[in-house]
């Protein structure tokens, strides 16, 4: 066999049926259990107490989007995640978009992102303690002294031992700082689901 491009798509994602762990007590739980991949368009969460399980990209996208309507929202996390809050638009991307064709601009931006990503990962692997401090300080810059950064935003592992979570424009931090967001962080291991009013 020969080819110019070979895709090896052996990932663990299943977009038809996303992974849902088996929770003891699920059948007796009186609330709703919603998987983000099966989000009902008519989901009513106005003034409800919501728990989002996880601390990755989906959680940091869902939480700010729901925060204004819920009575309280809790991020239940097994372990904190490293967050990085880059701008969603970079000046170089905008420059290339303005002064090149779409095809050339896309090609250049794509390669810039690939090379920058590879460089960043290689640097983190060479100096993990330096970048751990940098990432944690980035969260501190967004949240100030309002949160227990060590408990809720400092993983026990080194950066890139697990995936880093990008939070474009730091919107979850903005939501937390707004004071409008009724958010709790809880470290957990779920043993039983129950409904407590």
What are these regions (language model features)?
Residues 1, 31-33, 189-197:
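Conserved beta-strand-loop-beta-strand element in the redox core of flavoprotein oxidoreductases
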